[in-house]
Every structure is written in structure tokens, then in C-alpha cells.
């Protein structure tokens, strides 16, 4: 269980961040990468990149294991709660699992098997909030088109629901735009 960060103050790469606590032999390394993606206007720029890399990797591991990507994450979170590896994880596994279960239900993940719809999922904990998404995409004239996004957020008590909705929707649009057009 080891983390090597690149010396960036307040790095989002943390020794106690998921999937820490759920897997043995965990190593996370951080380094700089030249990219054409601008970060000036990103919302929480360092966390976005870590989340994207982490979630893509978890999808690859789930696929290699022959497991559903949401169920795979839920298995890891169950292990992190019942038999944690290490101590002092900075997330609450049950809250993390809660947003995954909710987005799985709302998106009818297990039953929506339309072969023309490509689905993806991601979940992340950062800034004291748990977020899980399911994105449905179709191809139109050879180009990807986002059809629908499902989102579940557990950020604790929400004082201003409109502001929370605006932040979530703006973050989704920002992230989708960068993923589709900046890479």
C-alpha cells in the first residue's frame, strides 16, 4: 500500500482515498503530463483529472475481471467497510456505495440493454461529497452524442438546492465537453 505524489501542495492523490482500503498492494503515482486540455476554468482541476484516470482504470479492471462496473465498485466498497485494508480512509464506504446504488437504480442500469446506447459510469469522493454518474451515449453519423446523464450526489445538508443543482449540471456539462472535445 503505497502512494507517491509529485510534491504538489494539496494533491488530490491521497494515500487514504478510494480504492485505498479496498485492495491490497495499492500503489498510486502522480506525475505531470503535457496536455492540450486547459485547466484554468476547470472546477477543482486536480480532482477532475485524478477522478477520470481512476475511474477509467477501475472500468478496465472490472472488464478484465468479467464484472459489471457498478457491481465491481460496490464489491470494493463492501470490502472497504467490512474488512478494510489499512486505516484512516478519508471516505465513508456506505455513503460512497449509496450514490452508486441510487444512480444504478435511477438509470435502470441492470435492465436497460438497448444495443444502440453505450453506457458508462463513474463515481468519486472529493471535497466532502460523493458523486456517481451514468451516461448514455448514442452514435449519430459516426459521432458520439450524449443522450442522457443520471447523477446521484451525497454532499450532506444542502442549504441552497438551486445552487447545488447548478453546480452539478455545470460540472457535468464542463466535464463532458472536455472529455469529448479537448482530448
Which residues fall in each region the model found?
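Active-site rim segments in enzyme catalytic domains, especially the processed small/beta chain
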Residues: 1, 10, 101, 157-183
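Glycine-rich loop/linker segments at domain edges
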Residues: 1-56, 178
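Hydrophobic alpha-helical scaffolding
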Residues: 9, 13-16, 40-51, 62, ...
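Short beta-strand elements
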Residues: 25-27, 131-153
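N-terminal leader/propeptide and maturation segments of large enzyme subunits in energy/redox metabolism
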Residues: 34, 38-104
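Generic, well-ordered alpha-helical scaffold segments in large soluble proteins
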Residues: 57-64, 75, 99-107, 137-140, ...
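Helix-loop-helix junctions that connect adjacent transmembrane helices in secondary transporters/permeases
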Residues: 76-140
